[in-house]
Amino acid sequence: TDEEMLAIKENGGVMGISPWAPLIWKKEKGCRPDVKDYVDHVDYVVNLIGIDHVSFGADNTLDGNKDDKGTADQAVLYPAVVGAYNSCVGTRSDERHAKGFEGCWQLENVMDEMKRRGYSEEDIAKLTGKNLLRVLRANWN
């Protein structure tokens, strides 16, 4: 919720934004979300809590392995979020993340979209690790 995100900001934390498709899916669009939809989500959170409190939260494997069991588990664990998405888009594990950001190897697609929207190199550096490092260093003395 917005309140939870504001609490993260108030406590100096960082929120990782996931490309998990059911979270960023725009129902009216009727199709699997893409990189632009993901960056729309990033924009919303950055506008709410500020660039210093946002990071990428890829939530997928580095090697691109598909997790069909995890996909099935999601439908059971989060029926309100996943049910409508599955009905419209499908249940294949390769449809679980935004098109063009299926894994960390495609982070460049996200960075390119952010540059198109006017994010600076420093903003992108914060989102790709600088913010997380700041919080980890502050807490892992």
What is each stretch, according to the model?
Residues G30, N65-A72, L136-N141:
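Short glycine/threonine-rich loop-to-helix capping motif typified by GTGT followed
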Residues T1-G13, K36-H53:
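Histidine/acidic residue-rich metal-binding segments in metalloenzymes
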Residues M15, D59, I124:
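Conserved, mostly hydrophobic/aromatic
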Residues I24-D40:
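Active-site glycine- and acidic-residue-rich loops that bind
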Residues S18-P19, I49-Q74, Y78-G100:
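Short acidic/histidine-rich active-site segments
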Residues L23, T61, G129:
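Positions that flank functional sites
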Residues V14-E28, N65:
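Active-site clefts of carbohydrate-active enzymes
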